[in-house]
């Protein structure tokens, strides 16, 4: 009998494999994306020092009142735009995109494209 694959385990395996290959620096931090059922989170992380340089989410004060549900494509676009603007304010233009094992589709894709439109290069 065939068993259904555990999607969370597959994502975790993909995440570990990718994280071994990418590294964020002070000059080019890692743009990490986390997707929960009701919210989207994005961080720029300098892995050399272990510091989060910029963070944005649907729970950020700038966006919290805008969306009733932060777990949709429109909210992801807003988070991508916000993280891009905050990064440019800190003088960061180039990042390494870390989709954290999520497929490049839907909310993850919308966040990435909005960050690119805001001025980030990856």
Curated annotation (Swiss-Prot):
Keywords: Ribonucleoprotein, Ribosomal protein, RNA-binding, rRNA-binding. Coiled coil: none annotated. InterPro entries: Ribosomal_uL18_bac-type, Ribosomal_uL18_bac/euk. One of its GO terms (molecular function) is structural constituent of ribosome. GO terms for cellular component: cytosolic large ribosomal subunit. Pfam families: Ribosomal_L18p. One of its GO terms (biological process) is translation. Part of the 50S ribosomal subunit; part of the 5S rRNA/L5/L18/L25 subcomplex. Contacts the 5S and 23S rRNAs. This is one of the proteins that bind and probably mediate the attachment of the 5S RNA into the large ribosomal subunit, where it forms part of the central protuberance. Belongs to the universal ribosomal protein uL18 family. This is Large ribosomal subunit protein uL18. It comes from Desulforamulus reducens (strain ATCC BAA-1160 / DSM 100696 / MI-1). The lineage of its organism: Bacteria, Bacillati, Bacillota, Clostridia, Eubacteriales. The gene is rplR.
């Amino acid at each position: 009998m065939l068993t259904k694959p555990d999607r969370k385990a597959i994502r975790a395996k993909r995440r570990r494999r990718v994280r071994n290959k990418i590294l964020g620096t002070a000059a080019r931090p890692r743009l990490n994306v986390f997707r929960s059922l009701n919210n989207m989170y994005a961080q720029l992380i300098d892995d050399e020092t272990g510091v989060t340089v910029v963070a944005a989410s649907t729970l950020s004060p700038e966006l919290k009142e805008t969306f009733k549900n932060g777990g949709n494509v429109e909210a992801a676009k807003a988070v991508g735009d916000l993280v891009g603007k905050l990064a440019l304010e800190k003088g960061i233009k180039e990042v390494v995109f870390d989709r954290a094992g999520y497929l490049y589709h839907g909310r993850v894709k919308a966040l990435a494209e909005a960050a690119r439109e805001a001025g980030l290069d990856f």
